Amino acid sequence: MAVAHLACDSQGSVVDLSGQGLQKLSPTLPFGNDTQTLILDKNQIIKLEHVEKCRNLVQLSVANNRLVRMMGVAKLIHLRVLNLPHNSIGYVEGLKDLVHLEWINLAGNNLKIIDQINSSTSLQHLDLSDNNISQIGDLSKLKSLKTLLLHGNNIASLRAASACLPQSLTILSLAENEIRDLNEVAFLAGLVDLEQLSIMNNPCVMATPSIPGFDYRPFIVSWCLNLKVLDGYVVSQKESLKAEWLYSQGKGRSYRLGQHIPLVQYLATVCPLTSAHGLQTEEDAKLDKILSKQRLHQKQLLHQTRSDGYLTSSTPNKRLPLSTEHHSPTHVLQTEPTVQVNNWLRSSSSEDHSYAVRNICSSPFGPPHYSSLYMEDIQTDEDKLNCSLLSSESTFMPVAPGLSPVSPTVELRVPAIKADLPVNETVIEFNKDHTELPPSETPEKPKLIPGLSAMQDDKSCCVYPVIKDENVTENIINCETAVSMESTQTSNGPTCHNLIMNCKQASVLDQDVNHINKISKAATKLQSCWRGFYARKYNPKVKDVCYEIRLSRMQEHIVFLTEEVIRLRKEKEEDRIQRILQGEAVRYLWEQVQAIQQWQNTVKLQTANSSENDLPSASNSKHANPALEELPSSPEKLNRKASPDIPDSGFHSVILNHCTMGNTEKNSSEESEYSQPSLDTGRHYNDKVPDSPADQDLTREEQSQSSKDSFTSEQDSSLLQQYLRSVEQLDETADNTSYSERTEESRPEITTCSDNSDLSCSISHFLPENSKQENIDIHSNLPSIDDGHNTPIPCDSSLLVPQPDLV
């Protein structure tokens, strides 16, 4: 196993065993009592063993391993720095005796609670980010704690912050948690020394489609009054003024816990989110006006102090500042626009990490304290709206100077000049391409006016804005105002001449600035077009994004086509089922039609057989009953009654002749009562007096066949009910007509027939079976009604062959 070499420095020995594939620590490893720094990063260590022999160990780093417990550090009582990120540690232990600990990093573990850290009273930095902590533990005994990083956890409430967090806390990171109510920020009001706070990427500050955009920064500043940096951006003067207004006159502190939606709606009205300069509200315009007046007043005071002799003519290379802001160590007023500061790393080196800084011009005759100025990475409001910095990586974690984020509009910042002079915190930018005027055109400036000499000596280092052209005009107006104020103090001729020349130079400067701004805009547009083309063609990340967009569109199209295919398939299935039902219905109707045709053929055959059987029975009754033929009646009228006009429908019904059994004065109801015995008598006579045995058998077969046919026809009788009703109506009409005619023309014949019928019926009813043959002889001996006609006219229509009841 390879062992890393020992590297000793002035502070003691350093043992670096990172990336060696170690799974455990053996006693033979090269570290002893003199080891002060031990680095075991990027190994496979599960348990810390044999590190207690390093009694003087001050710094220990075991990052990116497989540690489950941290009890192995319990005996390292001199330990000051403990770095254990990205392991599998479940709970904090072994820190009870480590009273000298100042820096602990436990990020990226499986911690759920904060415990056993109160004993490390010297702790200043505690990193518990990217764990599973759901609530803030008790850290009130850590009086020296300055930095607490809790981003990337599951914290949903800050109720315990005022009681569990120490008052000395200056940096607090709560980003990427589960805080859903913006009113939870009120519990941070007790942290009076809090200067930097991060609350980004929480549900309470994230934009939603149902809620209009709002700026939460003034509301948080209204609770944390000493806050200087929020979410990685410096709190601007405008935000401070809005926070003061929310605290004093607005409703910022009137909302309580659980009223997140009303608070957000209120902030959307008083602090709307505007990303462009042309979308400023009326309140923003008023604030800008107030701040501009404040800067103008400060300029006037500066000029007044210079004219009084604060700045003499012996310092001709001093510049006229564009804006000056006084500040105290406890409260610093930042100038507009809002800037982003990485204030963990401040380097005095001359390395330039920003491509927006054109040139740094300094006068060789300037004071020596300008050489001690240093640069910081700053960012304007436009970059703040377009950036996606995570506080856990870019804001609260130190990075190397060469890897610091670069902003396209980074400017030079001068935080301090000298203790005995007002501090200038104006964001300025120098242009090295500015051409100086020829010396011949510059008039000789008198030494009586120090302000003018300072202005004219400043031509070699011109100030240009980055964002707005209005700033240049305002600066020129301020310059003219300052010149006019100083001109009132003198009355000589050269001073007026110098004022005129200064105004001309200001106008020329304005034209040059406009021309340069146009060129800059054109160059920026060309660069943006080229960068877009290059990114789309050669940048792998952009190509991957374009590929993902194409895949997403293709997926959406496939989903749409799938839905269409499913819909068409359902429609086709419904059409198929409908066609099947229609086919079944047509088949059923065809079967019904076939059944009706078969039944019609059966009825026709039955009718034909009945008509053939009627003829022999009628002839037999004529020969057997000659006396009945002699009854006085009109054959034409009887035939007209027996066969009325019935439409030929294929279903012939036999009309029974009812003989009247009473006098002509009786009504139709009495005649119907007498017709029933006559019908029974006729049937009885027909049954008892057959012509021959063969005819009797044929009659019985026909009756049984007709009964079967009638039973079969009952199933389809409903189809003929309407037709038979119409036939019955015609029959009743014909019966009434024929009956009225017969009663008037042949009343004696009907009476005689009725008497004879009653006599024969009564005789046949009371005679025994052996005497019924004699009754037949009696009827045969009766005289014929009409010898001239061969058609037999029976007394009752029941003598015919009975037909089946079709209804």
Curated annotation (Swiss-Prot):
Q: Which GO terms describe its biological process?
A: cell projection organization; negative regulation of cilium assembly
| Family matches, as SUPFAM superfamilies | L domain-like
| LRRCT domain location | 208-246
Provide the residue span(s) of the region labelled Disordered: 306-330, 607-756
* Function summary: Acts as a key negative regulator of ciliogenesis in collaboration with ccp110 by capping the mother centriole thereby preventing cilia formation. Required for recruitment of ccp110 to the centrosome.
Fetch the InterPro entries from UniProt: Cilia_flagella_integrity, Leu-rich_rpt, Leu-rich_rpt_typical-subtyp, LRR_dom_sf
- Mark the transmembrane ranges: none
Instruction: Please name the Pfam families in this protein's record.
Output: LRR_9
> What spans are recorded as compositionally biased (Basic and acidic residues)?
681-690
What is the name of the gene encoding this protein? cep97
Every copy of the IQ domain together lies at 519-548
Protein name, entry field: Centrosomal protein of 97 kDa
Can you name the source organism? Xenopus laevis
Q: Which UniProt keywords apply?
A: Cilium biogenesis/degradation, Cytoplasm, Cytoskeleton, Leucine-rich repeat, Repeat
Q: Where in the cell is it found?
A: Cytoplasm, Cytoskeleton, Microtubule organizing center, Centrosome
Regions of compositional bias (Polar residues) in chain numbering? 607-623, 704-724
Which GO cellular component term is one of those annotated? cytoplasm
The ranges of the LRR repeats are: 34-55, 56-77, 78-99, 100-121, 122-143, 144-165, 168-189
